[in-house]
Amino acid sequence: MSDTTFDYIVIGGGTAGSLLCNRLSRNKNHRVLLIEAGRKDDYHWIHIPVGYLYCIGNPRTDWLYQTEPDPGLNGRSLRYPRGKTLGGCSSINGMIYMRGQARDYEQWAQLTGDDTWRWDQVLPAFRQHEDHWRLDADQLAQVSEEFRRLHGNKSIGSGGEWRVERQRLRWDILDAFAQAAQQAGIPATDDFNRGDNEGVGYFEVNQKGGWRWNTAKAFLRPTCYGRPNFEMWTHAQVSRLLLQDLPGGGQRCTGAEVWTGSEMVTVHAEREVLLCAGAVNSPQILQLSGIGPGELLQRHGIEVRRDLPGVGANLQDHLQIRSVYKVQGAKTLNTMASSLMGKAAIGLEYALKRSGPMSMAPSQLGAFTRSDPGQPHANLEYHVQPLSLDAFGEPLHDFAAFTASVCNLNPSSRGTVQLQSADFRQAPAIAPRYLSTAEDRQVAADSLHVTRRIVSQPALAPYRPEEFKPGVQYQSDEDLARLAGDIATTIFHPVGTTKMGKSSDAMAVLDSRFRVRGIQGLRVVDAGAMPTITSGNTNSPTLMMAEKAAGWILKDPEENSRTSSAEPEVLFRLTL
């Protein structure tokens, strides 16, 4: 920590922060500091795909947040996992590669007044860092004509850092569920990333050769580690941002105060501070710095530097309702892992082949469909698993079963993230307010009816599925909505707490280029910037946002005269 002045300070070494460090430090004249509150991603369970079970709820890798008791969940409080390690949530998540639907980004363009957020404008940013299995040399000849017809030359990329692969195992019970979904009217698909996700099929995942592929591997190691202009601090937590008043009004962010575990260090940014701490921690850091709802800050004795009521508001998340079905005559993870011999066989298969249950994502099969025929588009997502348990961290059930988890892709419920004191070490109050609207409660009930319709199809009949949760005795919409509050849990997709928006939107924290309103030299680049939640898993959209942010930052007029010192681009781009 000999030098405390840098060009760019990146706060948070997770999904967005890792990519930004990679892109900004390519120019040898850019001194880049990465500040990460967690540890290096050297915990072995991070890299074994099934290891998410041992990372969630583990202080080595998780912030261990809890939500406030939630009326929509009948007073329950949920564990709210957030990655506290290099790679952030990409080190502990479900590894599913999902862009979202085209209409998500068309809506962003409308809400921000910026057409660069339209679907056809974000696709290049997705492809920029993509390394897709379909474009591997040994796979090109097998790409179907149907895939080519659907996608033309605007679909996937190769040669980037972000590896996308097929899953390395299949299950008969999941194949039967897919067939049942088709019998229920949901079409088959081999691609959930074409812009219209409706269909049933197997998810693609961010893995490489049977290992989790997190953003620390993809963007930091070894590339950034070998650059003399890049510095990284781990176990270092930002207590607040430093703001300087400007003549004529407004402020400029000049740096941050950082607790290293033994001392408070002040770091300075000559160009920009990039806050990438996630949809929970970024609003907390802003609030601790005097940026946020004035009344909230004053209540905790914090000087109001910029009254932005939207900081910590607009929290959105996907709430998964987990229906569990007992089955007969099916191989499931419950039965495979029920004995020492079974566990040994699972471990041996992974050790020898990097395949089998230890290589699997939490959810293998997915489906996008509509909660009722009147919906104009797919508003439900299924994550189907060949296992069952009462809650993450609990043991698997001792009977053969599968779980059909369904979530409302576009909830209208909105929550908050608010600091609880001026002490940066105290966790913020997280109040998602799930199922707080009549619309969301109706979709919850409808989604359980859809699940039952799928499971009742002939394809699953040989396995004699028996509903274990929520229970066939509950039939009315009112009962099912109430039961959803008893059994539903987060699917770990919080977004929106520092949203982008038009200048006319009083709740917008950022402009469409991630710049904090009224404060120069400060951007927030993470899932909190999303105006609305995407229709699917949120990790890869966050990475796309960081790619666009990097491009905008480097196009600053000050940079134009310095581009000659940038490292040559060695990655190639191949699109299909």
What function would you assign to each model-found segment?
Residues 1-129, 136, 307-308, 318-320, ...:
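N-terminal glycine-rich phosphate/pyrophosphate-binding loop and immediately adjacent elements
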Residues 533-551:
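A conserved FAD-binding loop/helix module that cradles the flavin
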